[in-house]
């Protein structure tokens, strides 16, 4: 597995070794031992999630607070998405910075997003299926998020018009509101 560093040290792009011929392809999408070797510490995933979304759907930017924070290993298994991780660790040198990556069924890349990051994605293809592993269970009372168009973060989305958001995602906080409300620490 090839590891590609991003502008934020702790966020990694993982690129599998793909074996292909006229029959199709094969690749190992996850190997616990290899993954922990890359990170340098043990990780225990407890939940796998799978979503299907239409073009222009924007999901996020989500995170869970406190003891329910989650590390995530994400990938797009059908179609393509623009995937984003935002550093919300107040003491981090990259606090408020973001990383954006094209994840697709074609490139088969995965993005490692550690605790302390908000995460979201924009569907670029007609349909996208998105799968991710988490190190903590979903906990509705700890669910939180940052609005996709927060001017302080200034994510350079591939498009900003015609987006489809859930009512919940339309009401998310700005980073400054999260700080003022003490929802990140």
UniProtKB/Swiss-Prot annotation:
Active site: 62, 132
Catalyzed reactions per annotation: dTDP-4-dehydro-6-deoxy-alpha-D-glucose = dTDP-4-dehydro-beta-L-rhamnose
Recorded superkingdom: Bacteria
The protein's annotated pathway: Carbohydrate biosynthesis; dTDP-L-rhamnose biosynthesis; Bacterial outer membrane biogenesis; LPS O-antigen biosynthesis
GO CC terms of this entry: cytosol
Keywords: Carbohydrate metabolism, Isomerase, Lipopolysaccharide biosynthesis
Protein purpose: Catalyzes the epimerization of the C3' and C5'positions of dTDP-6-deoxy-D-xylo-4-hexulose, forming dTDP-6-deoxy-L-lyxo-4-hexulose.
Summary of subunit composition and partner proteins: Homodimer.
Record's protein name: dTDP-4-dehydrorhamnose 3,5-epimerase
